[in-house]
Amino acid sequence: MAECGASGSGSSGDSLDKSITLPPDEIFRNLENAKRFAIDIGGSLTKLAYYSTVQHKVAKVRSFDHSGKDTERDHEPPYEISVQEEITARLHFVKFENTYIEACLDFIKDHLVNTETKVIQATGGGAYKFKDLIEEKLRLKVDKEDVMTCLIKGCNFVLKNIPHEAFVYQKDSDPEFRFQTNHPHIFPYLLVNIGSGVSIVKVETEDRFEWVGGSSIGGGTFWGLGALLTKTKKFDELLHLASRGQHSNVDMLVRDVYGGAHQTLGLSGNLIASSFGKSATADQEFSKEDMAKSLLHMISNDIGQLACLHARLHSLDRVYFGGFFIRGHPVTMRTITYSINFFSKGEVQALFLRHEGYLGAIGAFLKGAEQDNPNQYSWGENYAGSSGLMSTSPELGPAQRARSGTFDLLEMDRLERPLVNLPLLLDPPSYVPDTVDLTDDALARKYWLTCFEEALDGVVKRAVASQPDSVDAAERAEKFRQKYWNKLQTLRQQPFAYGTLTVRSLLDTREHCLNEFNFPDPYSKVKQRENGVALRCFPGVVRSLDTLGWEERQLALVKGLLAGNVFDWGAKAVSDVLESDPYFGFEEAKRKLQERPWLVDSYSEWLQRLKGPPHKCALIFADNSGIDIILGVFPFVRELLLRGTEVILACNSGPALNDVTHGESLIVAERIAGMDPVVHSALREERLLLVQTGSSSPCLDLSRLDKGLAALVRERGADLVVIEGMGRAVHTNYHAALCCESLKLAVIKNAWLAERLGGRLFSVIFKYEVPAE
């Protein structure tokens, strides 16, 4: 987020000057490559949306061409790495106060060079008011779009594409935001938009919705009556007054009417019997704060009851609230949530959206881009370029609040392939990828934020070392450090800024920030070297395994999987060893492992299962490059193939830490096939299939996987899922329930986490699960 000089002391003119002189890459990023625009102008805020292309570096691997050569390949790297420029699509959303609209349009005009469009889609009440100004400044024709259609299109888009977009507000919780996991079936729902008035819309599908009701008593009523009662003209100042008021001084409560007899009615004595009821009889002056609070309760309760009645009428249990009246204000969300809970007896859920302020702009953009069919793609929030859900609490006072004089930002990257649920999830709506919610667990939150802060020096050092020929690598690495450090400080103050805070979101944010400053794969050369070493060891490891008896071999294969998983550059306990001892290898890793019984030990049950019929098809999610994939995973895969089980080996689509990528796995498999007839024939006969997950994360979200992978899982009838590594099997998916057998295994390489789980460093998780009949 770029501050616009808003300390509360300067004039709006000073703020404006400072905001517009900020570098364009801080606010209107990639503006020079903007292709299409949309704008949503409300009563006080403007939301600009634009689609641009982003050029960034990606690391690609390619097998060496050995044709016609008779050379000694033992000490040659297994593949070559090249860094290429890639162009991807990104959606940018910028939110700012209407005060700045003319200066912002001038700024856009000055930096606009590559736009392909002659039209800008516009929605919101201000679209008509500012039409001439926009056309004059940008020389683009304004096409006005229907407000409600845009809101609904925007709402559908964020619910589908942004995990943890929706949240419930719980007044007495810490923090007060409870984020919902992505529901695979978002329809039907009720959208209640509270602007000047209230509109209530039933949304049934992507394109089918109907206006079912509304009210003239909305945000405009609160503003208008509030101004008359308190002489306060500014909406946010009214909310600030309300946050400090005590409504019971003005409202008549049930206990004021019935005394102690209210209990026979089954009502709480604190319920409002009559809004402003005391003002007619009490001979006293009421404070502005109390009147504002009473007014807020009156209007929120009215809206809540109306929404609840419509939800029940249409048999809906999810109601999303948005509009100028909400805007993430705790005092407003609190009263609406209370009202919905009371009138529905807890059967209807009041939900709010992290990005509700952008819905109109997103919808207007989607309307203008229909010929490009943006809904055929999946999109992901780019944490590096988004300012997150900032505190808007009126309790802070208007002068201190981050909203005043700021530009809020949201960026969405278009993903290469559509993402869908893993078909083997037992109950997709209840699936939660993350094991620990750090917004809930203050002790864990403090530990992990400190852990990521302390690791920053090492990440910066690794990033610089990965680009020895770059003259500006150190400068870019410092920019990365500052950006990620700032994100961590934001999350210390506001753990809910980007939805549910988890170890996964901290890792993903770091990867986004590294990509932002053109460090696409800091571990590429480390992986190349370790893959080369491990490939040379592969024949010996397989020969050794083949000499063992069946039962002894099964344990050796599992220990090999676990030992391979030790080689994780993302774990400080391991990276310290690998950097200080270049001879630390596969056998040394085996000796590090906890002796049986392991911390979680289902090995006996797994061995018993192996004595039964072979699985039809195993889906394996691999973790690290090098020893892990080559000496741990591939021998395990080979054994499954020998049993008659088909194998789908799923690896990351893009790089993260030293995790193996799909591109690397193809080359590794090709090299192993050249040494091993079992793997060779399985690849040729398509009994071994290598696929990409659609992810570039060290963790695993089974609700956002490559559509092609999901189709293959269905087609091959996968009946075993193997998830390997701390990020995929412990930080995520430890509690994931599947409708087939599963194996989750990892070595705990973090002493704090191991102790929390009741173990020690290098404790072993081996969790074999069979679904209930």
Swiss-Prot record:
Does this entry carry the keyword Phosphoprotein?
Answer: yes
Q: Where is this region: Pantothenate kinase?
A: 2-402
Give the EC class as a word: hydrolase
According to its UniProt record, what is one Pfam family this protein matches? ARMT1-like_dom
Q: Where is this motif: Subfamily II EGMGR motif?
A: 724-728
Enzyme Commission (EC) number: 3.1.3.-
Q: Which residues carry this modification: Phosphothreonine?
A: T406
Residues involved in acetyl-CoA binding = S196, S199
Q: Give the family per the record.
A: In the N-terminal section; belongs to the type II pantothenate kinase family.
How is the subunit organization of this protein annotated in UniProt?
Homodimer. Interacts with PKM.
Which species does this protein come from?
Macaca fascicularis (Crab-eating macaque)
Functional description taken from the UniProt entry: Phosphatase which shows a preference for 4'-phosphopantetheine and its oxidatively damaged forms (sulfonate or S-sulfonate), providing strong indirect evidence that the phosphatase activity pre-empts damage in the coenzyme A (CoA) pathway. Hydrolyzing excess 4'-phosphopantetheine could constitute a directed overflow mechanism to prevent its oxidation to the S-sulfonate, sulfonate, or other forms. Hydrolyzing 4'-phosphopantetheine sulfonate or S-sulfonate would forestall their conversion to inactive forms of CoA and acyl carrier protein.
| Name this protein carries in UniProt | 4'-phosphopantetheine phosphatase
